Amino acid sequence: MNVITNFSPLLKDKELIDDLPIVIRVKKFDESAAKEFSEKMSLAHNTGQPVVPVIIDSYGGQVYSLMSMISDIMHARIAVATIVQGKAMSCGALLFSFGKEGMRYMDPDATIMIHDVSSMAIGKVEEIKADAEETERLNQKVYKMMAKNCGHHEDYFLDIIHEKSHADWFLEADDCLKHNLANHL
């Protein structure tokens, strides 16, 4: 994740640079990316910009880091526009759905992939059972949130994933429009 910082060499005045719009790029979902996302969201609030563009091009990552980013978006005082370039897979697809209604953009050649939350549980039987319960709780939570964001009943995406035998579900841009994930191509 990075903020666009390659300004014109004609901009010498630091105050002008501080007021430029912040654009957030999300390429991965881990603790450092979540921290950087939070910092950039805070900076965006101080620019006076009416919208924070969040550009997603990611294979996914850690769900807890995604939850931190979602929290930042939900507590934002300005609108968040999400934009998919290339791919938004797993956590990337979920984050995409948190763009403000009417502000979810997708490149016509981009792909989204949705699947069950996964776990790398190892350990004693009871630890694995506890991890499986937490994985199921997270799975239910994030896909119900996604369904709400897209104007569907809460089990909409969970039902489709179940119908697809819990396999990875790849969607092209046109399919994302049909499911109200994307608002614009």
List where the protein language model places each region.
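STAS-typified acidic loop motif
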Residues: 2-39
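Catalytic phosphate/metal-binding cores of nucleic-acid and nucleotide-processing enzymes, i.e., regions
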Residues: 7-15, 43, 72, 78, ...
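Second-shell loop/turn segments in exported
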Residues: 23-28, 55-59, 126-132
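Terminal peptide-recognition signature
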Residues: 37, 54, 96, 112, ...
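A structural preference for short, pocket-lining loop segments at secondary-structure junctions
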Residues: 37-58
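Short, surface-exposed connector motifs at secondary-structure boundaries
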Residues: 49-52, 74-80, 154-157
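Glycine-rich beta-to-alpha active-site loop
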Residues: 59-61, 68-69, 73-119, 165, ...
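Charged, glycine-interspersed solvent-exposed loop segments at helix/strand-loop junctions
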Residues: 121-185
